[in-house]
């Protein structure tokens, strides 16, 4: 019975739980709010597990579909479904939300109910965006998740939180208005808002495709974010609380890249081929130049934020590598796998930074040193995540990057060679930070007073470590889910619409 409504449950359980948490009222009821938030996040995660276990790896198209009329007059419907790509993001989002609720358990003392509720509501909205089969429904969820994210940064962020949250809101909103225009144009062509109908349009002139490409691209590129519209991300990460940074890096950035896969590539294949060289150049700039920028950062959060931009450059590179008019198989699948891996690794890195910040209240690398002497268990976990961020084999960080590099070499050796620089830069800035923070003499007397991770922090880091190692040692479990959906997308993009 419930199998027919799994996606609706994945969307609405967190949202309803968020409303219930809000209803707990003042801070004096914080323990109740935390327990309700944990129950809601856990239920939201558990309901996504049948999506993975029950997913048919051999069949293409959408599964677990739901359809209900929403606004019949405008042919706008509540239509849901997941394919081999989106199903992984729904599960990842629910998983990270559970980790975020645990991460903020004892840390957030100011308005904890509202804090937990914002994450739960945002989780449901993000799941809605990943599962939507109606373009206007996607737009509502895609834009709606900005409101709780804006509040998370603006209320619980650092000293410059208002600046960071407003910058984030303006950047993303300006791009999204153009996407709305493009969606309305396409709806006139097919008489509705079904994304599959958009994808199955037989003929779109190249000039129109190019205009639509620009409209969609500006919206999704800001969300990824791609160079040069990336400047909001470091500010947002630095000011956001730990949970905000975890969700921002692990989930929110993936919405932009998912938009490329769901809208731009299948609906506008000729424009995608036309603009592919531009996307490749911008992606390589993100991989190489932003990697160099990360090398000179003194703030740990800002360093990992620039690292995220560099890794997401790898993702967009993999999505736009064409050979004889066809998308490269290895690169496309590698891009999706890299997104899932980055979700685990970036969340873990920001969790590690949050653990240290909670003890010393500074993110400056120079304020640390010798942490291994007082926090050996924490140092071991951070070593694993730092290695994964650098792309060490047997960790999840290696799999997607290796697949994209293999695909890039098939397209052009020099593109592959430049892309491979991310392995060098990733190791350089990540291990440089790790060495200065964890090893060496205790430079700050306050470091000597730091306590090792408690049971709650150990549990969060251990679960993330299992995810990073599990995906690195057995990536086939993820690749086989993505395989058929990626092949269907490649076949679709190969057909010209001119």
Label for each model-derived stretch:
Residues 1-6, 20-117, 192-200, 487-488:
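Transmembrane helix-loop-helix hairpins at membrane boundaries of multipass inner-membrane proteins
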Residues 2-13, 82-93, 135-148, 209-222, ...:
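Structural signature of hydrophobic alpha-helical transmembrane segments
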Residues 8-24, 38-51, 92-104, 122-124, ...:
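Central hydrophobic cores of alpha-helical transmembrane segments in multi-pass inner-membrane proteins
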Residues 18-23, 49, 98-102, 124-128, ...:
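Alpha-helical transmembrane segments of multipass membrane proteins
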Residues 19-27, 97-109, 151-160, 224-238, ...:
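C-terminal ends of transmembrane helices
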Residues 27-32, 114-121, 125-208, 293-306, ...:
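Alpha-helical multi-pass transmembrane bundles of energy-transducing inner-membrane proteins
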Residues 55-77, 176-231, 235, 260-278, ...:
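Juxtamembrane/interfacial segments at transmembrane-helix boundaries in multi-pass membrane proteins
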Residues 227, 346-350, 416-449:
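Predominantly late transmembrane helices and immediately cytosolic-facing juxtamembrane segments
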């Amino acid at each position: 019975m419930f199998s027919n409504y799994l996606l609706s449950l994945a969307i609405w359980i967190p949202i309803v739980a968020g409303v219930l948490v809000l209803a707990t009222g003042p801070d004096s009821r914080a323990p109740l709010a935390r327990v309700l938030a944990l129950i809601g996040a856990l239920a939201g995660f558990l309901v996504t597990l049948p999506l993975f276990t029950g997913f048919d790896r051999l069949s293409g198209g959408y599964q677990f579909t739901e359809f209900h009329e929403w606004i019949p007059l405008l042919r706008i419907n509540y239509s849901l479904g997941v394919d081999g790509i989106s199903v992984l993001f729904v599960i990842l989002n629910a998983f990270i939300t559970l980790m975020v609720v645990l991460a903020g358990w004892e840390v957030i003392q100011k308005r904890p109910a509202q804090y937990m509720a914002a994450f739960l509501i945002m989780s449901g909205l993000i799941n809605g965006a990943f599962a939507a089969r109606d373009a206007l429904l996607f737009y509502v969820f895609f834009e709606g998740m900005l409101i709780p994210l804006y509040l998370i940064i603006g209320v619980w962020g650092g000293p410059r939180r208002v600046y960071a949250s407003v910058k984030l809101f303006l950047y993303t909103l300006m791009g999204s208005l153009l996407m709305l225009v493009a969606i309305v144009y396409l709806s006139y062509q097919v008489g509705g808002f079904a994304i599959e109908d958009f994808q199955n349009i037989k003929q779109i002139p190249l000039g129109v495709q190019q205009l639509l490409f620009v409209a969609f691209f500006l919206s999704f590129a800001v969300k990824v974010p791609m160079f040069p519209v990336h400047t909001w991300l470091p500010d947002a990460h630095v000011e956001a609380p730990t949970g905000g940074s975890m969700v921002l890096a692990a989930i929110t950035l993936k919405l932009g890249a998912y938009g490329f896969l769901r809208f731009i590539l299948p609906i506008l294949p000729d424009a995608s081929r036309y603009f592919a060289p531009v996307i490749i150049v911008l992606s390589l700039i993100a991989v190489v130049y932003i990697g160099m920028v990360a090398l000179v950062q003194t703030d740990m959060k800002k360093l990992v934020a620039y690292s995220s931009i560099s890794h997401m450059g790898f993702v967009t590179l993999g999505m736009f590598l064409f050979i004889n008019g066809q998308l490269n198989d290895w690169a496309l699948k590698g891009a999706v796998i890299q997104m899932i891996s980055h979700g685990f690794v970036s969340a873990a890195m920001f969790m590690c930074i949050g653990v240290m910040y909670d003890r010393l209240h500074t993110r400056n690398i120079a304020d640390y040193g010798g942490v291994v002497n007082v926090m050996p268990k924490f140092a071991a976990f951070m070593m694993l995540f730092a290695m994964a961020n650098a792309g060490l084999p047997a960790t999840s960080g290696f799999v997607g990057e290796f697949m994209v590099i293999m695909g890039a070499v098939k397209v052009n050796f020099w593109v592959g060679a430049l892309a491979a620089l991310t392995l060098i830069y990733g190791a350089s800035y990540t291990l440089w930070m790790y060495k200065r923070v964890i090893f060496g003499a205790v430079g700050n007397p306050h470091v000597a007073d730091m306590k090792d991770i408690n049971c709650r922090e150990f549990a969060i880091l251990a679960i993330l470590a299992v995810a990073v190692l599990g995906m690195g040692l057995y990536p086939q479990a993820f690749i086989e889910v993505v395989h058929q959906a990626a092949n269907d997308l490649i076949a679709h993009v190969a057909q010209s619409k001119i």
